[in-house]
Each structure stands twice: as structure tokens, then as C-alpha cells.
């Protein structure tokens, strides 16, 4: 019985994802961030006049633009 429990414990530890990664919304679905990407962003930018573009996803640092949202919890940039 002890051997079975020990085996189960070892298999569980090996199968677990020991590192935490942030999950952010993209325009279509979710994105799992790289370990160094600590923030989710949602920002609107204009590449051309009167044509706003929405950008969403993981980022290394928070954008400082006027129409931007930056947060650091899972799925916070909806």
C-alpha cells in the first residue's frame, strides 16, 4: 500500500506544471504567456486616421498610451 501511494505521489509531482504562467485574452481566444511576460494588455491604437486597431495579449511591460489597460491576473484584459 505504501509503495502504491509513493508511486502515485511521484507520478503526480512529475506530471504537475510546477511553473506558473499568465493567461491573457487575445482577439480570438486565449494566449499562454511566456514566463517573462508578467502583464496582460488591451490597447487601442490608430495606424491610420479613423481606423482604430485593438491589440490584446501578453506583454513584458505596461503600455503608457492613453487608451490602454494593463493588468497582472489571468484573463483580466477582456
From Swiss-Prot:
Site residues by UniProt (Important residue for inhibition of muscle alpha-1-beta-1-delta-epsilon (CHRNA1-CHRNB1-CHRND-CHRNE) and neuronal alpha-3-beta-2/CHRNA3-CHRNB2 nAChR): 28, 43, 51, 66
Location relative to the cell: Secreted
Pfam families (alphabetical): Toxin_cobra-type
Site label Key residue for inhibition of muscle alpha-1-beta-1-delta-epsilon (CHRNA1-CHRNB1-CHRND-CHRNE) and important for inhibition of neuronal alpha-3-beta-2/CHRNA3-CHRNB2 nAChR, positions: 46
Major subcellular location class: secreted
Site (Important residue for interaction with muscle alpha-1-beta-1-delta-epsilon (CHRNA1-CHRNB1-CHRND-CHRNE) and neuronal alpha-3-beta-2/CHRNA3-CHRNB2 nAChR): 67
UniProt site (Important residue for inhibition of muscle alpha-1-beta-1-delta-epsilon (CHRNA1-CHRNB1-CHRND-CHRNE) nAChR): 45, 47
Site-annotated residues for Key residue for inhibition of muscle alpha-1-beta-1-delta-epsilon (CHRNA1-CHRNB1-CHRND-CHRNE) nAChR: 44
The protein's role, per its UniProt record: This three-finger toxin binds and inhibits the nicotinic acetylcholine receptor (nAChR).
Name of the protein described by the UniProt record: Short neurotoxin SNTX14
Protein source organism: Ophiophagus hannah
